[in-house]
Amino acid sequence: MAFNSQEIIQDVRAEFEHLLDFVTGEQARTAKADSIERGLFKMLLSLGAKLLQLFFAMRSEACSRQPVQSKSGQELPYHRDTERVYFSIFNKVIIERPYFYEKGVGAQIPLDAELGLGDDSYSDLLREITEYLAVYHVYGGKNADFLDRLFGFSLSTRALQQNVAEDAESVAAYYAQKPPPCPESEAEILVIQADGKGIPMVLEEDEVAEAQVRLGKGQKHGHKKEAIVTTIYTITAAPRTPTEVIASFFKENPPKKRLKKDAKPQNKHIWATLDGKDAALSRLTKQVALREGAHILHRVALCDGCEALQARIVLQFQGFLLILDFVHANEYLWDAANSLLGETSEQRLEWVKSRTLQILSGQTVQVIAELRRMAKNKKTKVAQRKQLTKTASYFERNLPYMDYPTYLSNGFPIASGVIEGACRHFVKDRLELSGMRWLQTGAENLLRLRAVAENEDWDAYYAYRRAQRQLRLYGQSVSNRQPLEAQAINSQPVLQSLVGSGHPKHSQLPLAV
């Protein structure tokens, strides 16, 4: 199929005239805004397909058919034009390219390199849009419906999974070469956090062979594997009193005067892996090394009561002050209160608040003693005794990491809200939806791209990946010139103002510059 640029130009002009008539013609005078907007969008997609086809046709016509040199320096004559499909947001478009070939020497298609094409049919923009959706929503179902409603087509679940797998391959390499944040953008306290979250897994082949044909009551086809989520950031010291923490934590009226706004994490970097605690913390040590410097005055490690994680953190991060996450400590008090007073008792809140204040004020030993006294009381039921003892033992084991008065006076963070939110949002909200079961490779791929998105590295990562692909496929480096889409937007003040006023997080969407 031969495409003539002049014929396409005529079609484009005719279609554009049709667009003008659609918004200025007789029917537009009585049309509803909704019908015009919907019609315009579909027509613009159609026009976009023709314009993209015109671009490829003109590039093909301008491409020389004179012999080219192979990598070995031998001459490759023009053989014929060959076609490839370019699957874009405007649907599929055909690209005709001159094909140079000599038997026994090899083949080349120079236009592929000039256009920066990948080794499959999907356009980079289509990949980025669909993968961004896949990072936050299930592969099929509503995700596919959204694409179909927006563009008039969708990708299969298998195609999406394959694209995610391919585009996740370079994430580790990207972060290995990414420079650390500049010291001027950092705060004085370097904070690391680690926590685990279970992901439902399908049985691997060797496990399937050993599985029962018929499961017993309560058994499931699969199991959970722990993903270790790590976070590193810096934060400004924010001294506060136990009373202020209680007021904030229990949503009481805050003090009338606040000397400064709540400190916010700076340059937060999040990561999750199914490769185990050692692999996760080993990577975290490298991140710590990148963030170190004279600007860092204090180092804090926040963790829940997981003994395995605590032991590794103490060993691998010896310059860090390990702090037991205050939220986890408080949860143990709630467990004790529920067991002792009943889950519907109105007395629970005051009981928990008073003992939380004791813990924050450095009286954890007294709380432990009280819990053990109640556990030994003859009137205490067996279940209550078990929970009270469990809570007391948890506090006793973690006493070295519960010097909250010192932490608060120094302005250190005592709650791992960042990592708790990450476990819920980063892992659970995407990988633990109803009915989901994962293979480790599939879950790992998705976790890597979710990290790219959550770390607000989406645009930079995909630019890096395109550059690496150009080098791998064609041995060429990518120009540092301003992208054409940026030039187009910068030449239009209205578009520039729209892009510039966007929400920072949304600026990383594939359509943004």
Regions found by a protein language model. Name each.
Residues F56-D119:
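An N-terminal low-complexity regulatory-tail signal and nearby short nucleic-acid-interaction modules
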